Amino acid sequence: MASQGTKRSYEQMETGGERQNANEIRASVGRMVGGIGRFYIQMCTELKLSDNEGRLIQNSITIERMVLSAFDERRNKYLEEHPSTGRDPKKTGGPIYRRRDGKWVRELVLYDKEELRRIWRQANNGEDATAGLTHLMIWHSNLNDATYQRTRALVRTGMDPRMCSLMQGSTLPRRSGAAGAAVKGVGTMVMELIRMIKRGVNDRNFWRGENGRRTRIAYERMCNILKGKFQTAAQRAMMDQVRESRNPGNAEIEDLIFLARSALILRGAVAHKSCLPACVNGLAVASGYDFEREGYSLVGIDPFRLLQNSQVFSLIRPNENPAHKSQLVWMACHSAAFEDLRVSSFIRGTRVLPRGQLSTRGVQIASNENMETMNSSTLELRSKYWAIRTRSGGNTNQQRASAGQVSVQPSFSVQRNLPFERATIMAAFTGNPEGRTSDMRTEIIRMMENSRPEDVSFQGRGVFELSDEKATNPIVPSFDMSNEGSYFFGDNAEEYDN
């Protein structure tokens, strides 16, 4: 996927723009990020938050969720048509935490959706600024990816929990547009397609009539998005087969699960962007930084820079480790939930631990948790180096599918060889004789068997000093190969529940 050809860059997807040159992209992404910051500052004023309260990541998330809910047209329409008792469909809200007498207290705020939309538009030059909303969705999705494991969802669709590294973006809402589709992992797309096929099998009218025609168009579009993520001809040909099926059923589900497994070695191309909480953008705007004039990129040094000098707090439960909470948020900020821990550790400059070793639960606090015992602490979100985010699955230049790992989807474009247990992965292919046997399947299995873990990915790509903003001196790290690199390895992370 080296040739960009007709592909729009992330930033163009992110800003809904047509083809632009680098400066225009930087300016429009800057405008988007600056708009989020201006909106956040205005909300802090409206809610009368002190400086410290405005830097609390939990407050940031509540404010982000409120504006996303205000613009969720489908759900708003549904709520107005199905009124539930004691709930005003025109209002939205959430917990805001304030500092009172040396303690953190929770206050539930309710806000008029119309008013939120007005404040958001005003912060974004009177526009709807859908790109900014999608950006917030991706930040929430990255946070979920780093916090929860989707074992249950995988098992429900007949996939293997070991495929968790393919599940990036699995909690993104449907309405997240092209930018959302770009960051979804192969497993996420497969899961969406399987759910769709299962509905079609169980509900005779799913593919029929005017509605069914629209469903069919959506199905084919999702197939094309998934096809575009695969980097080998055989995988793409198999996707054509799934897309063209007259009446999708079990054969297609089998093919999709086969393709998802194959993606553990023949990696898909999945975009990664650093999306920061709104309060970070707010802090920068408040300090007089002009994002649009300076320009901004989600895949370069800018987010690292921003995190180097912003102070964000988080509420900490009594038995949680603040350093571990920081790691969780750092990973979410850089979309690194499925990155090799050795690469993340090198960039961050402190050891990044697997999820199972972290003494921390999610960032959000449930409404029934006791606030009396809550403390707050500063999140350490700084890094030692920065690296360019990647949208390749990490294949070598020879376009030969190179190694993946049962749990790595690279986030950073940094040279490494991707260790993987071929035996473990190939074992997953022996169990199931169902599905069509085809030249494509044979070809895919052959490619997987021939891929070598020793092959180096991202040749010559390295990390950069934070002073090296033009990325002139790559430092190519050497990694200790004995170290297991996956984050959800042997894990006991909580499940994600909607």
Swiss-Prot record:
Disulfide bonds: none
InterPro entries named among the record's database cross-references: Flu_NP
Regions crossing the membrane: none
Highest taxon of the lineage: Viruses
A Pfam entry, by short name: Flu_NP
PTM (free text): Late in virus-infected cells, may be cleaved from a 56-kDa protein to a 53-kDa protein by a cellular caspase. This cleavage might be a marker for the onset of apoptosis in infected cells or have a specific function in virus host interaction.
Motif Unconventional nuclear localization signal: where in chain: 1-18
Short sequence motif named Bipartite nuclear localization signal, residue ranges: 198-216
A cellular component annotation (GO) from this entry: helical viral capsid
Positions of region (Disordered): 1-22
Family: Belongs to the influenza viruses nucleoprotein family.
Function: Encapsidates the negative strand viral RNA, protecting it from nucleases. The encapsidated genomic RNA is termed the ribonucleoprotein (RNP) and serves as template for transcription and replication. The RNP needs to be localized in the host nucleus to start an infectious cycle, but is too large to diffuse through the nuclear pore complex. NP comprises at least 2 nuclear localization signals that are responsible for the active RNP import into the nucleus through cellular importin alpha/beta pathway.
Protein's name in the database: Nucleoprotein
Species lineage: Viruses, Riboviria, Orthornavirae, Negarnaviricota, Polyploviricotina
